[in-house]
C-alpha cells in the first residue's frame, strides 16, 4: 500500500493551492504579447470569439456544482454565480458584457453566438471543464474555481494593457473586466473558505490541488 501522508494544516494547504499560479494563463505567450501591445485586431477578435465559449458555459459549470452539492449552506453561497453570468434580465450579466466587448473589437454578435470561429481545442477544453464539474465530487468543482485567486491581478494588468496599447478599442467596452475584478476578489475568498473547511484529509486536499491544476490547463488552452 502507498504511504499515507498526514493532512496539511490550513496555511500549508492554502500554500499548495496558491502554488498552482505558476500555470496560470497570464504566463501564456499569447497573453504576454497582448499585454505588450503586440496583437493585431484580427488576433484580438479570435481571442474574444473563442473566450465567449468559456464565458457562456460558466453558468452551466456552476449549476453542476450546485446540483452535486448536498449542503444547502454551500448551495446558497454558490447560486449567485449563476445569476452573475446569466444576469437577472436580458442584456444583463457577465455574458452580456462580454458581447459588448465583442462589438468593440469588430465582431458581430451573430458570429460570436453561432461560434463559427470556435477552435476545436478550445471547445474540447471547455467541454472537459463542464464535464469535470458534472462528474467529479462537488468540492473538486469548487476547488477548480480557485483560479480566481490569481484573476484580479491578471485582469487588472490586462485592462491596463488594453487601454494603453489598443487605442482603437472603445474603453467603455472593458466593463466586463472592471466588474469582474471586484467580483473575483469576493468570490475567491468565499471559494477558498469552502475548500479549506471541507478538504480536511490529505487525499481530499491532494484532489483539490489536482482540480485546480486541471483548471489552469483549461485556461491555458
PLM region descriptions:
Residues 2-221:
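Non-heme di-metal
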Amino acid at each position: 500500500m502507498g504511504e499515507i501522508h498526514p493532512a496539511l494544516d490550513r496555511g500549508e494547504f492554502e500554500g499548495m493551492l496558491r502554488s498552482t499560479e505558476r500555470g496560470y494563463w497570464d504566463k501564456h505567450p499569447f497573453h504576454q504579447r497582448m499585454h505588450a501591445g503586440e496583437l493585431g485586431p484580427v488576433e484580438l477578435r479570435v481571442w474574444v470569439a473563442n473566450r465567449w465559449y468559456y464565458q457562456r458555459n460558466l453558468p452551466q459549470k456552476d449549476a453542476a456544482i450546485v446540483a452535486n452539492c448536498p449542503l444547502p449552506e454551500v448551495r446558497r453561497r454558490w447560486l449567485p454565480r449563476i445569476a452573475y453570468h446569466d444576469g437577472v434580465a436580458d442584456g444583463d450579466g457577465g455574458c452580456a458584457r462580454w458581447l459588448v466587448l465583442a462589438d468593440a473589437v469588430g465582431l458581430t454578435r451573430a458570429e460570436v453566438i453561432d461560434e463559427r470561429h470556435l477552435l476545436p481545442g478550445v471547445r474540447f477544453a471547455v467541454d472537459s471543464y463542464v464535464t469535470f464539474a458534472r462528474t467529479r465530487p462537488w468540492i473538486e468543482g469548487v476547488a477548480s474555481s480557485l483560479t480566481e485567486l490569481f484573476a484580479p491581478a491578471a485582469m487588472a494588468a490586462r485592462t491596463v494593457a488594453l487601454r494603453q496599447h489598443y487605442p482603437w478599442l472603445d474603453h467603455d467596452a472593458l466593463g466586463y473586466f472592471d466588474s469582474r475584478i471586484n467580483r473575483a476578489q469576493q468570490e475567491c475568498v468565499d471559494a477558498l473558505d469552502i475548500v479549506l473547511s471541507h478538504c480536511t484529509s490529505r487525499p481530499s486536499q491532494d484532489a483539490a490541488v489536482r482540480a485546480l491544476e486541471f483548471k489552469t490547463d483549461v485556461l491555458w488552452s
